[in-house]
């Protein structure tokens, strides 16, 4: 196998030679997971974009990967790609695999060079380039990103971009162009003389665009309190920030102690500028460069000192640490049918996870397998997993790894497990205590590079103390069944499970259903689906008008064309195209040769189809006496939808609703022309409700919402058949007369009316929402007489959602007054979510459940002859007359028997609990060889709930529900236990979608191993990633010393809590936000303090419309001050959402940090995706200030808290008086008087708090004398 070269010791000239060789490229064999045959390709490094590309020919790149996304470069034949292709003839020393991506499941590029020397060169070069990319300055990253944009429109890697291409690119990077005039004006401003920009001009255009959009942020540095005063900010180079000013900024605003050294400040500026012409003793930043610095990762909010390992903190017993832990580590997705993979173990270990789970079952040939038992998840070999653990356990962290074994194997296969552990892991395996006489667990330092086995252990007399993790309902029938779909008249496969006399089923498994083979399209009809084919156009003039309008909008490119049926010659066609500023036409003639229709423009070159003719002239020139021309851009047919079955030209809204109400299936849809307007509406069914959405016309485009542009309605439908239109709903069932006849049923009136929202329209959302209640997230003081003043926690009733971000509501004595919508959260929405959680709480399919059948209301019968081409069928016949039967089928007769028997026992109301228990009873035998490997993590269950007298050699495992019960009832007992013993908590069985529970309360009580699903990109996994970003990402974080104090209470009474600090945050702007789907993002930011219940609080900004590239919230956005009780155990979380066309929030990016790890000042917040992977150049700019609360100020904050609580009580009492006539009386006047007095007093207290914050800030902002 090829060994990695230590590139750190290579001289610079050798590094340059290696990089040059990679840039020139190497012919290699590429192994593709989707292809059984490897292919020869040229693989090369594109230095300008920092991408590895592979291509068959020089002018056509087949694929590429960003070098910053590389997670591992693995030498040898160590990927499945080599196995699939049976790469026998390629030597292992010439092979390597690049693993890359930003999701949990990584992509692979497996390569084989022709020589060992080439392989070494590539392994070394990739490592060098990856190191350089990860340490590149932000201006360098911006230049690379700009190159990618140019190359994305032209793979020839030219050094320029046209105005038309620029207009195409900007929406793709999340910026809405108001019109071609906007771009032309910008080009004039940067001095471009024509509609073609060089790369340097493109770079200037980008800088000018970003600066103009965000220069208002710099007003923050024109205030008297600023540590330096900026000059003119009208233009990017209108003024500058000089060395001494920058030092003042770093020292006083950013509180960077290293900035006391002027040389370090000079070095920071010089490296950031990266301009040899400005490498002087007195460097400066132009104002646009200063603004870019504020957004850059060089100015990150994260304190980089926590990237280093604190070795002094690694000498405590293991029980004093939080330990990064994974649940069902082998899974790459959900718990029912996802893939099990050794790569999942590698991904978790290299992410710093230190406790992983092995779910072991008897396998073939006497060797165990790992998978999620009793489900359809795939199986992997135990031996392969142990080898992967050996190779990757200590790559990221050298501290111990705990293997949590869930044992289902026979004794014989357990012996094999013990043998493999010892042979493969060798000296890594911990087989005896570090200290024989110790009375506590060893420290992480004592256990470096050791692997610990957590497994059941035989006692001194051979007895077993077991801990069987909760696997509720795992032995009841569950698996895939076919269900008969009466709409599509076909069998669809669903995952089903029985629990509590109910059969639950998930959504249909579309990829598993056999599809009818696609019929080959006859050559003569190939052009029908092409957008350049316009069928019969009214006249020659109409065709010319279409071309003229298209060319006026797109830049009049020669060769722009369309094809139409000939007006005068049957079977012939007309090619209309744009050349030299006018439209020209050519007749496409047809002739019959040997019974086959041929088409031609010139007599000497005929084609079998119109499609073949057009494809030829798009690649080769059309030559005639006057000109040579190649067909370029097709003019799309504006009306291809008219022939589609889902389109209705004259259908009213009421008629559309009536049709949709008869199809009780999410994804049913139609599109109709709206009466009296040049717009359309899509009517669809989602979540059981009928909804509408308007589609407007903008020139030749169809626009859904404000920025989702489509060339045609056909393209719109095709897109949303593959992507979610509303929440998770895709278009699936075109509503046609045939479908209505097939599914002939009564109208479902309930589907039309929805208590939460009846009509979904991006432009016309019903503003009247009576009786809605919202909760204030923060204090707000009215700025006008028609606005509400309220305190955090206040309930505002009878809310009416007005447009523009201002809503109306009732609070106290003030009726229907305005307040900002981003200061509140909708309680009713939260209640609906909580209700949904309650419904799925005990469902065996959890949130994946799409339907439930109560088996007590059915009789089950077999279909002896089968049905609908399935041999093994059973039918649930309803006991209630009139209800339709439900038909199921299996693949095997054994499955049919098992399901039929289980359902029959329920429907006959037989008590089979005792029989089932006997049938599924487990043999708890343990192999001595495996038992002997258990040293410290011996599970116990006999006295698991008794937390007294912990044994440090034992570990107690709790399902999340049991752990939550203990936390609520005896949090202090659990904390005391965890100071000496270990606990592991894992998700409940109902989380089949692999969702995660909130780990915080368990961390608060000292639980070390709070196991989460690493493959799930949710909030709690992101918090987990944030916690373990401390201490150099070792996977071990020392719990605060205060938690080991005898006086520490993880859940103190309110009277015992003290505010220790305040955190003030202001969101100023963002850059390079990611883009979802076709629409340009309309972003807003949610800022949240995550911690104990008494610390949790959040705030939302307003929505910025149609700008995800450079949105700004300053200067209108106000500062928000959070009160923090325990800064050591709280997180600051930023989440960026986009508001979609239905006013629903969609996750875009996040950044989550432990509060102890953030820095003050004007800070960049680098954004991450759901999996906490960096997003290129994406960042927020925020102002952040932390201030400890002095003991003398605690009384003031305590008074504020008490008044807020009292105001909430008074407001609720007043609401009751005003909504219940029988309660009206004299008491109301007293309540009103007290409410008003308290409100004034609260405002005074709040002003006093704010004044102290301002005074503190001014004292920190003095100039150097």
Swiss-Prot record:
Pfam families for this protein: C2 (PF00168), EF_HAND_2_PLCG (PF23583), PI-PLC-X (PF00388), PI-PLC-Y (PF00387), SH2 (PF00017), SH3_1 (PF00018)
Cofactor: Ca(2+)
Predominant cellular place of this UniProt entry's protein: membrane
Domain (PI-PLC Y-box): residue spans on this chain: 930-1044
Coiled coil: none
Alphabetical GO biological process terms: antifungal innate immune response; B cell differentiation; B cell receptor signaling pathway; calcium-mediated signaling; cell activation; cellular response to calcium ion; cellular response to lectin; follicular B cell differentiation
Enzyme Commission no: 3.1.4.11
Annotated ranges, domain C2: 1038-1169
The PH domain, residue ranges: 1-131
Keywords, alphabetical: Calcium, Hydrolase, Lipid degradation, Lipid metabolism, Membrane, Phosphoprotein, Repeat, SH2 domain, SH3 domain, Transducer
An example Gene Ontology molecular-function term: phosphotyrosine residue binding
Domain PI-PLC X-box: 312-456
Location in or out of the cell: Membrane raft
Residues of the active site: 327, 372
Reaction(s) this enzyme catalyzes, per UniProt: a 1,2-diacyl-sn-glycero-3-phospho-(1D-myo-inositol-4,5-bisphosphate) + H2O = 1D-myo-inositol 1,4,5-trisphosphate + a 1,2-diacyl-sn-glycerol + H(+)
Residues spanning the signal sequence: none
Task of the protein: The production of the second messenger molecules diacylglycerol (DAG) and inositol 1,4,5-trisphosphate (IP3) is mediated by activated phosphatidylinositol-specific phospholipase C enzymes. It is a crucial enzyme in transmembrane signaling.
Quaternary data: Part of a complex composed of EEIG1, TNFRSF11A/RANK, PLCG2, GAB2, TEC and BTK; complex formation increases in the presence of TNFSF11/RANKL. Interacts (via SH2 domain) with CSF1R (tyrosine phosphorylated). Interacts constitutively with THEMIS2.
Protein name: 1-phosphatidylinositol 4,5-bisphosphate phosphodiesterase gamma-2
Organism: Mus musculus (Mouse)
Lineage: Eukaryota, Metazoa, Chordata, Craniata, Vertebrata
Primary gene name: Plcg2
């Amino acid at each position: 196998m090829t060994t990695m070269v230590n590139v750190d010791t290579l001289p610079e000239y050798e590094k340059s030679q290696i990089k040059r060789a990679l840039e020139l490229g190497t012919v290699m064999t590429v192994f593709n997971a989707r292809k059984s045959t490897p292919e020869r390709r040229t693989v090369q490094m594109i230095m300008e974009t920092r991408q590895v590309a592979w291509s068959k020919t020089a002018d056509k790149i087949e694929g590429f990967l960003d070098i910053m996304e590389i997670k591992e470069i693995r030498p040898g034949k160590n990927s499945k790609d080599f196995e699939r292709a049976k790469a026998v003839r390629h030597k292992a020393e010439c092979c390597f695999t690049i693993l890359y991506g930003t999701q949990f499941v990584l992509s692979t590029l497996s390569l084989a060079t022709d020589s060992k020397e080439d392989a070494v060169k590539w392994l070394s070069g990739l490592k060098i380039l990856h190191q350089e990319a990860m340490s590149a300055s932000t201006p360098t990253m911006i230049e690379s990103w700009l190159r990618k944009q140019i190359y994305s429109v032209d793979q020839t890697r030219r050094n320029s971009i046209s105005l038309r291409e620029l207009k195409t690119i900007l929406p793709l990077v999340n910026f809405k162009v108001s019109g071609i005039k906007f771009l032309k004006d910008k080009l004039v401003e940067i001095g471009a003389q024509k509609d073609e920009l060089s790369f340097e001009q493109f770079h200037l255009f980008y800088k000018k665009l970003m600066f103009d959009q965000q220069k208002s942020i710099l007003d923050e540095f024109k205030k008297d309190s600023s540590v330096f005063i900026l000059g003119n900010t009208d233009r990017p180079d209108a003024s500058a920030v000089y060395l001494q000013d920058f030092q003042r900024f770093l020292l006083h605003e950013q509180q960077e102690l290293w900035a006391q050294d002027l040389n370090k400040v000079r070095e920071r500026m010089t490296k950031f500028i990266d301009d040899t012409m400005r490498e002087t003793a007195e460097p400066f930043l132009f104002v646009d460069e200063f603004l870019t610095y504020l957004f850059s990762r060089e100015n990150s909010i994260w304190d980089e000192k926590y990237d280093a390992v604190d070795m002094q903190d690694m000498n405590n017993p293991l029980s004093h640490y939080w330990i990064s832990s994974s649940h069902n580590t082998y899974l790459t997705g959900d718990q029912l049918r996802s893939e099990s993979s050794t790569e999942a173990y590698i991904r978790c270990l290299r992410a710093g996870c230190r406790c992983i789970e092995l779910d072991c079952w008897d396998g073939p040939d006497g060797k165990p397998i790992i998978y999620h038992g009793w489900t359809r998840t795939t199986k992997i070999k135990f031996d392969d997993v142990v080898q992967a653990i050996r190779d990757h356990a200590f790559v990221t962290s050298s501290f111990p790894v705990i293997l949590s074994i869930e044992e289902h194997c026979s004794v014989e296969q357990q012996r094999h497990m013990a043998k493999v552990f010892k042979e493969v892991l060798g000296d890594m395996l911990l087989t005896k205590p570090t200290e024989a006489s110790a009375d506590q667990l060893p420290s992480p330092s004592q256990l470096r590079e050791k692997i610990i086995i957590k497994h059941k252990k035989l006692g001194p007399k051979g007895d077993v103390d077991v801990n069987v993790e909760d696997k509720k309902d795992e032995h009841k029938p569950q698996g895939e069944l076919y269900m008969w779909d009466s709409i599509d008249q076909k069998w669809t496969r669903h995952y089903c499970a029985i629990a509590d006399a109910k059969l639950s089923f998930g959504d249909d498994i579309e990829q598993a259903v056999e599809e009818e083979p696609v019929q080959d399209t006859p050559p003569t009809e190939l052009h029908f689906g092409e957008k350049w084919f316009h069928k019969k156009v009214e006249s020659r003039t109409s065709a010319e008008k279409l071309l003229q309008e298209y060319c006026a909008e797109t830049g009049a490119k020669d060769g722009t064309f369309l094809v139409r049926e000939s007006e005068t010659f049957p079977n012939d066609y007309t090619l209309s195209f744009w050349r030299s500023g006018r439209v020209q036409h050519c007749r496409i003639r047809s002739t019959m040769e040997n019974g086959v229709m041929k088409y031609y423009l010139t007599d000497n070159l005929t084609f079998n189809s119109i499609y073949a003719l057009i494809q030829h002239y798009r690649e080769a020139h059309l030559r005639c006496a006057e000109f040579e021309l190649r067909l370029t851009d097709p003019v799309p047919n504006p009306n291809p939808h008219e022939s589609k079955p889902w389109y209705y030209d004259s259908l009213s809204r009421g008629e559309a609703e009536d049709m949709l109400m008869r199809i009780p299936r999410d994804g049913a849809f139609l599109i109709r022309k709206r009466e009296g307007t040049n717009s359309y509406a899509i009517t669809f069914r989602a979540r059981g409700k009928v909804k509408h959405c308007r589609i407007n016309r903008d020139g030749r485009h169809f626009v859904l919402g404000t920025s989702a542009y489509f060339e045609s309605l056909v393209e719109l439908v095709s897109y949303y058949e593959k992507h979610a239109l509303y929440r998770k709903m895709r278009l699936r069932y075109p509503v046609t007369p045939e479908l209505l006849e097939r599914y002939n049923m009564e109208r479902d009136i309930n589907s039309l009316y929805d208590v939460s929202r009846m009509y979904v329209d991006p432009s016309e959302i019903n503003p009247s929402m009576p009786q809605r209640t919202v909760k204030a997230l923060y204090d707000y003081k009215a700025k006008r007489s028609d606005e509400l003043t309220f305190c955090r926690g206040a309930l505002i009733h009878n809310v009416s959602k007005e447009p523009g971000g201002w809503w109306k509501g009732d609070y106290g004595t003030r009726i229907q007054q305005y307040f900002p919508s981003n200061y509140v959260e909708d309680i009713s929405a939260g209640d609906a979510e909580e209700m949904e959680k309650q419904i799925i709480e005990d469902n065996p399919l959890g949130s994946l459940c799409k339907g439930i059948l109560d088996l007590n209301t059915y009789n089950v019968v077999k279909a002896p002859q089968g049905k609908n081409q399935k041999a093994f069928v059973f039918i649930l016949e309803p006991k209630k007359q009139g209800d339709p039967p439900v038909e199921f089928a299996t693949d095997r007769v054994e499955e049919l028997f098992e399901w039929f028997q289980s359902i029959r026992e329920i429907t006959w109301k037989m008590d089979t609990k005792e029989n089932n228990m006997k049938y599924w009873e487990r043999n708890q035998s343990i192999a001595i060889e495996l038992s002997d490997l258990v040293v410290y993590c011996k599970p116990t269950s006999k006295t698991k709930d008794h937390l007294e007298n912990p044994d440090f050699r034992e570990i107690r495992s709790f399902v999340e529900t049991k752990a939550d019960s203990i936390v609520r009832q005896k949090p202090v007992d659990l904390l005391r236990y965890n100071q000496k013993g270990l606990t592991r908590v894992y998700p409940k069985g109902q989380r089949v979608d692999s969702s995660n529970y909130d780990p915080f309360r368990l961390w608060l009580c000292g639980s070390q191993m709070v196991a989460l699903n690493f493959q799930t990109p949710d909030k709690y996994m992101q918090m987990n990633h944030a916690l373990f970003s401390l201490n150099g990402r070792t996977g071990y974080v020392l719990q605060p010393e205060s938690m080991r104090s005898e006086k520490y209470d993880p859940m103190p009474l309110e009277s015992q809590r003290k505010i220790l600090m305040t955190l003030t945050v202001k969101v100023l702007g963002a850059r390079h936000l990611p883009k979802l789907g076709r629409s340009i993002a309309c972003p807003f930011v949610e800022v949240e303090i995550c911690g104990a219940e008494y610390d949790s609080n959040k705030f939302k900004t307003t929505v910025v419309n149609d700008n995800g590239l450079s949105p700004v919230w300053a200067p209108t956005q106000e500062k928000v001050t959070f009160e923090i009780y325990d800064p050591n155990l709280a997180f600051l979380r930023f989440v960026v959402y986009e508001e979609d066309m239905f006013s629903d929030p969609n996750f875009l990016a996040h950044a989550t940090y432990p509060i102890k790890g953030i820095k003050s000042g004007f800070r960049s917040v680098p954004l991450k995706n759901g999996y906490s992977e960096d997003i290129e150049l994406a960042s927020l700019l925020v102002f952040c200030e932390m201030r400890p609360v002095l003991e003398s100020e605690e009384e003031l904050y305590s008074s504020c808290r008490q008044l807020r609580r009292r105001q909430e009580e008074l407001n609720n009492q007043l609401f009751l008086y005003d909504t219940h006539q029988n309660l009206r009386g004299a008491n109301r006047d007293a309540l009103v008087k007290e409410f008003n007095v308290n409100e004034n007093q609260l405002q005074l207290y709040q002003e006093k708090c704010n004044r102290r914050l301002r005074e503190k800030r001014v004292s920190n902002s003095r100039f150097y004398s």
